[in-house]
Amino acid sequence: MNDRGELFKPIKVGNMLLQHRIVHAPMTRLRATDYGKITGLMVEYYSQRSMIPGTLLIADATFVGEKSGGFPNNPRCFTKEQAESWIPLVEAVHKNKSFLFIQFWPLPGDLKDEYRNDLEKMQKITYSDCPQDPGGLPAGIHSFDAVQGVEVYKKKYMSKRDIQEHIQDFVNAADLAVNIAKADGVEIHQVNGFLLDRFVLGGFGDQCDPEYRGSIENRCRFPLEVLEAVTRKIGQERVGYRISPFSGWMQKIDFMEVNIYLMSEIAKRFPKLAYIHAIEPRKYWSGHKLVSSEQNTSFLQKYWKGPFITAGGYDPETAVQAANERGVLVAFGRNFIANPDLVFRIKHHIPLNKWDRSSFYLPKTEKGYTDYPFSKEFLQSK
């Protein structure tokens, strides 16, 4: 029983020929150094999970500039030294004949100074006494400015100059990721109310340049300009784009129209983009199960006809179903955390290890990171 249908058929994504359609989802794991450089622990983690040739791994949500983040132990890629620290990780993945994209993840705003470089203080607010999501959205986030009711971001007007500086950060980081670190590409993050999504959702209100607020066209201007600048620098085939059209409490009345407009513009302007990566509607804090089979991201596939990655609450059986019915790739987060040989297990119907949620965000430790076991069947196959 080794045939799992479309899920195990090769597919061309950007410049890559993948051997199956199971993708390692980008996550926040806090295993980098205090100043955002890649550690040997991270190299080991990605080496483990790339051992099935032809696997696409999307690496940790990564800061692209001082303006976009800055708290410790989260990867960064905006200096030459930071980019060089990625080289062993990328080489380990390539040695296994797999592929690596780096996700670019700007926070919703500029962190206040007291939180920027105080991991313990930020962790107490963000992750304590609340459910956790390794995709980067702690349950305590309930507004664009506050986490657990504490305002952690500076209140400031987002000027056109600020926006252009953010765009340049994306371009610089993409250049470093592809030309120094030698990653296969980058993924732009427009998810869950973080910076690009905040613009799309109108989350700055009147506190941003008039050209970037109000109408759907204006609200989508910033992410489209980011895509234009980044693809011009490194090529469309090296860029993926992640969205969360059903972002729970942030869902606007016109969210369908916004996402249809955005997807239509991306398809028109960037037809060679590597992929679109969309998060399914789900109940975030009750096990991440898919909300329904009727309401999902398939409406976006009417407008984007290229490679499409879906993520959110999948198990092996629902992944097989999605690939067969929708022709999609399927991203796994928590199951990839707990199963370094996830692709092998799914193909051969081997039960999965269960993840340990308490270890998702333990800084700089192998616990819950590189210590999950491979299946005996996988080890015997080597």
Swiss-Prot record:
Binding site for FMN: T28, H189, R242, R334
CDD domains from the UniProt entry: OYE_like_FMN
Enzyme class of the recorded protein, top EC level: oxidoreductase
Keyword Flavoprotein included in the entry's annotation: yes
Highest taxon in the source lineage: Eukaryota
Reactions catalysed, as given in the entry: A + NADPH + H(+) = AH2 + NADP(+)
Record-listed E.C. numbers: 1.6.99.1
Gene Ontology CC annotations of this record: cytosol; nucleus
Similarity-based family: Belongs to the NADH:flavin oxidoreductase/NADH oxidase family.
Subunit structure: Homodimer or heterodimer.
Protein name per Swiss-Prot or TrEMBL: Putative NADPH dehydrogenase C5H10.04
